Amino acid sequence: MGLKRFKPTSPARRQMIIPDFSEITKKEPEKSLIAPLKKTGGRNSYGRVTVRFRGGGHKRKYRIIDFKRDKVGIPAKVVSIEYDPNRTARIALLVYADGEKRYILAPQDLNVGDMVMNGPDAEIKPGNALPLENIPVGTVIHNVEYIPGKGGQIARSAGTSCQLMAKEGKYALLRMPSGELRKVPVKCYATIGVVGNEDHKNEVDGKAGRVRWKGRKPHVRGVAMNPVDHPHGGGEGRGKGHHPQSPWGQLAKGYKTRRGKKASDKLIVRRRNG
């Protein structure tokens, strides 16, 4: 995995930094593991915009990813590392000993030809999935479950990981990517290693068109709107006139928006902001 720069033949080319895709296997995606993906343009079933600045973009097919890693005790071989347009990480195609094929998130240091395993008896090496109770303290992990059997939800983006800090009774203590310390049941599965494509954070689109290809539309500032459209709208010049707010009047920039009482509060040992 590396990044590619270009000769400055245009202002966009001068700025652009994109992956070189050297780790990608040259093959079509596995047909049995892709599904149609319908575009919404940020609209809900009523046709109303629920997410602003979405629309257009290149057509995609969804890759069905195995986040549960519930095929226990059967070894699998990595036959390809592939690009997935729906996420920042790369994905790895596994072929199990019984012939079944599944996609997983490709961690760092997982290569074509490697063998991986799921289950309590799996070796501690990148790509293997085990319950937290079977993972040594201090291990770096990703694709961690919140609820046993639900499938991994924590640390799935490119370059992210958690660290197993301690185990006590029914819970394991994790340091989350945000720095938060959180308890998770020890029966939850996690995958060893750091999610691959760690250079994703250094990519630069270089031009507006590349962002449009991803389905993102221009993000209009509130101060550029009329008073009817945004709390920052109107007035002479660019002044807000009051505290920064969202389009719906929610205070921004430092105002805490998390709901007061949640069942998971008792599982958070230390918040990410102290």
Curated annotation (Swiss-Prot):
Q: Which domain of life is it from?
A: Bacteria
Q: Which SUPFAM superfamilies match?
A: Nucleic acid-binding proteins, Translation proteins SH3-like domain
Q: Where is the composition biased (Basic and acidic residues)?
A: 229-239
The disulfides recorded in the entry are none
- Pfam families assigned to the protein according to its UniProt record, in alphabetical order: Ribosomal_L2, Ribosomal_L2_C
Q: Which molecular function GO terms apply here?
A: rRNA binding; structural constituent of ribosome; transferase activity
What SMART domains does its record include? Answer: Ribosomal_L2 (SM01383), Ribosomal_L2_C (SM01382)
Write the record's keywords in alphabetical order, separated by commas: Ribonucleoprotein, Ribosomal protein, RNA-binding, rRNA-binding
Region (Disordered): which ranges? 222-274
* Gene Ontology biological process terms from the UniProt entry: cytoplasmic translation
Please provide, in alphabetical order, the Gene Ontology terms of the cellular component aspect for this entry.
large ribosomal subunit
Q: Entry's InterPro entries?
A: NA-bd_OB-fold (IPR012340), Rib_uL2_dom2 (IPR014722), Ribosomal_uL2 (IPR002171), Ribosomal_uL2_bac/org-type (IPR005880), Ribosomal_uL2_C (IPR022669), Ribosomal_uL2_CS (IPR022671), Ribosomal_uL2_dom3 (IPR014726), Ribosomal_uL2_RNA-bd_dom (IPR022666)
Q: Which family is this protein grouped under?
A: Belongs to the universal ribosomal protein uL2 family.
Binding partners and assembly: Part of the 50S ribosomal subunit. Forms a bridge to the 30S subunit in the 70S ribosome.
Which PANTHER family has this protein been placed in?
A: LARGE RIBOSOMAL SUBUNIT PROTEIN UL2M, RIBOSOMAL PROTEIN L2
What function does this protein fulfil?
A: One of the primary rRNA binding proteins. Required for association of the 30S and 50S subunits to form the 70S ribosome, for tRNA binding and peptide bond formation. It has been suggested to have peptidyltransferase activity; this is somewhat controversial. Makes several contacts with the 16S rRNA in the 70S ribosome.
- Its recorded name reads Large ribosomal subunit protein uL2
Organism of origin is Thermosipho melanesiensis (strain DSM 12029 / CIP 104789 / BI429)
Q: Which gene encodes it?
A: rplB
